[in-house]
């Protein structure tokens, strides 16, 4: 009986491991990803984030402020040659330039990426997904000074009915003023995001806690060595009604 139990347990463990491996999107397990990117997978949870977004082959996706291109490569492979990824970046000659997306788009195998200016973005087909990670708070910086209702309504206008916006960001304490908190800590109160997005017409459609860290005191700037890479983060999904 004991041997049968051990055999059954080993078989079940093997099957679970196989299922877990199979559940990892090919875009994440792609051997062509840089080692510097895969080293961040443990904290950025790309497989879980892809599943949360619902991104699939053939989708038209807008990635707002792609930074170093960590998700840019993954998204490009996830949507495949029948999809298209638009990477919206700041002025390449400005202080906030993000050259990584253009460099990736020039590499073989990433021909489905088009780099566009964040303002104005120009013409593009209606989108299935808009994604921004660790950047929504930046739109509240006092030096940026944008009308968030206009921004969010702009996203609404370029999204297909039933399309989604995924926002991942560093959480601030409840009630934190958005501009001051963005300036000092580069964080945002998740409730502010919900309020702004629903005011633009979106419906809150779900959240993921895979990036949460309740041990984060929420009082240090995200670049502080004591918390960098370990901040409490929220992932929200908003849907445009059909």
Model-derived regions: residue spans:
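A short acidic, Gly/Pro-enriched loop at the edge of an enzyme's catalytic core
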Residues: 59, 121-131
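A short glycine-rich, Lys/Arg-flanked "PGG" loop and its adjoining helix->strand segment in the class I
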Residues: 76-77, 146-161
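Conserved beta-strand signature within the Rossmann-like core of class I S-adenosyl-L-methionine
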Residues: 162-170
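A short SAM/SAH-binding and catalytic strip from SAM-dependent methyltransferases
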Residues: 127-149
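Class I SAM-dependent methyltransferase Rossmann-like catalytic core
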Residues: 24-52, 56
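Conserved class I S-adenosyl-L-methionine
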Residues: 57-67
């Amino acid at each position: 009986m004991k041997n049968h139990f051990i055999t059954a347990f080993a078989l079940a463990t093997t099957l679970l491991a196989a299922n877990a491996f199979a559940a990892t999107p090919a875009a994440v397990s792609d051997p062509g990803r840089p080692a510097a990117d895969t080293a961040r997978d443990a904290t950025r949870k790309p497989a879980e984030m892809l599943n949360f977004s619902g991104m699939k082959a053939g989708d038209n996706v807008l990635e707002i402020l792609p930074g170093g291109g960590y998700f840019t490569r993954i998204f490009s492979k996830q949507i495949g040659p029948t999809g298209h990824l638009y990477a919206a970046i700041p002025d390449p000659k400005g202080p906030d330039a993000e050259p990584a997306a253009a460099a990736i788009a020039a590499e073989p195998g990433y021909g489905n990426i088009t780099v566009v200016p964040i303002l104005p973005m120009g013409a593009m087909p209606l989108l299935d997904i808009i994604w921004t990670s660790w950047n929504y708070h930046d739109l509240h910086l006092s030096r940026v000074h944008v009308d968030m209702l206009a921004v969010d309504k702009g996203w609404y206008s370029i999204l297909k009915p039933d399309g989604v916006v995924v926002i991942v960001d560093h959480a601030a304490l409840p009630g934190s003023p958005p501009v001051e908190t963005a300036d000092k800590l580069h964080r945002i109160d998740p409730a502010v995001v919900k309020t702004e997005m629903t005011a633009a017409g979106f419906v809150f459609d779900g959240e993921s806690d895979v990036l949460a860290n309740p041990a984060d005191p929420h009082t240090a700037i995200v670049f502080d060595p004591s918390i960098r890479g370990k901040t409490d983060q929220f992932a929200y999904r908003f849907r445009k009604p059909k």
